[in-house]
Design a protein with these regions (language model features):
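Active-site histidine-anchored catalytic micro-motif
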Residues: 159-161
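Short beta-strand-loop/turn "lid" adjacent to the catalytic site in phosphate-handling enzymes
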Residues: 70-117, 122, 126-135, 152
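Conserved phosphate-binding catalytic cores of ATP/NTP-utilizing and phosphoryl-transfer enzymes
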Residues: 3-16, 117-150
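Conserved small/polar residues in nucleotide/adenosyl-binding loops
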Residues: 166-168
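Short glycine-rich, Thr/Ser-proximal phosphate-binding strand/loop in the N-terminal lobe
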Residues: 12, 16-62
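Extended, Lys/Arg-enriched charged tracts that mediate electrostatic binding to polyanionic substrates
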Residues: 156
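Short amphipathic alpha-helices and their capping/turn segments at secondary-structure boundaries
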Residues: 60-72
């Protein structure tokens, strides 16, 4: 297997405490994995091409192997996967990939850790209230309106859409 295409290695203070969480953003082209702290900070971000691994479980295993030199051992306390496809039941079939994600298989691969799934653009919708004003780019004419819904469109391997009724 070839090496990951992108890596951002930060300090990992949670490693010493032993507790950590895995977060992932998995699309039809790329899978990004990271460690999330209790405070919500993200570190040790690693990106793999979906074509590098025959399954999501094997990509997760490769990521876990990458964490060992940074003080992480074992498996996470919990994992959350933002997935490019409809979330229905235990399995998610990706819109533009041959991978199939299963909560039960991923939980077994993670030593019994709790595993949660959400759609990748639903994850963006959940993140909107946590953005700073410097994270926003005004598009089109006129001023932004605080009390209006927010729409997010994202071209990738497919086209993601999110409507957030959370007003900021």
């Amino acid at each position: 297997m070839e090496a990951p295409t992108d890596k951002v290695i930060d300090s990992a203070p949670e490693a010493a405490a032993g507790a950590w969480r895995l977060v992932a953003d998995v699309g039809g082209t790329n899978a990004r994995f990271a460690v999330a702290s209790n405070e919500g900070s993200i570190s040790l971000v690693t990106r793999y091409s979906v074509d590098q691994h025959p399954s999501i479980e094997q990509a997760v295993s490769a990521f876990l192997d990458e964490l060992a030199p940074h003080g992480y051992s074992g498996t996470p306390d919990a994992a959350c996967f933002a997935l490019a496809g409809p979330i229905e039941g235990d399995e998610v079939r990706f819109t533009n990939s041959t991978w199939v994600a299963s909560r039960s298989r991923l939980s077994r691969a993670l030593g019994g850790s709790a595993v949660d799934f959400l759609n990748d653009f639903a994850a963006i919708g959940h993140a909107i209230p946590h953005l700073e004003s410097s994270d926003w780019i005004q598009m089109g004419g006129g001023a932004s309106r605080v009390d209006y819904p927010i729409v997010v469109l994202g071209p990738g391997t497919g086209l993601g859409v999110c409507l957030s009724l959370i007003h900021i």
